[in-house]
Amino acid sequence: DDTIKERMRKSTSKVNDIILLADAPMIGADGSSLTAIKLFEAQVIPALLFNCESWIGITEGQINDLQSFQDKFLRKLMHLPISTPKAILHWDSGMEMMRWRIARQKLLFLRKIMLKDNSNICKRAIINEAILEAEGLGHECRGLATTVGLQDLRDSFKTTSKGDIRRA
């Protein structure tokens, strides 16, 4: 929890710089927020979600904090009141919600591990986790895969492509 809050705190100055750039006549002259959103996606999101595929047991509160950070950026960028419905905010920006960004990274990471040789220690840990019915990355990814309509990647990693995961 502290790590996520610290990352958000460190990213705040970048977010403010992006908003200032977007308000500048040369960048925001067309009235579009696309450039600022792309800058946010390129500079802030990678720093914020670095290594998120290993975040086992992330809480709903932490996901909400991350989503609020993104929503706050969008509201400031587009000069929208706090009363603007979140659904409209997400639809108009075209930005992926934090929950699904993290889920995609976890699923892609699990797929990458499962494509490794059977002697790989990480792959063996995932398999042992399933055998022992422990709650770790494999367990979380099984739930995520079911939610987005994919097969369990621990079994179907060879038939599930990166594109399938991204589209889901």
State what each model feature region is.
Residues 55-63:
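Acidic, serine/threonine/proline-rich low-complexity intrinsically disordered regions
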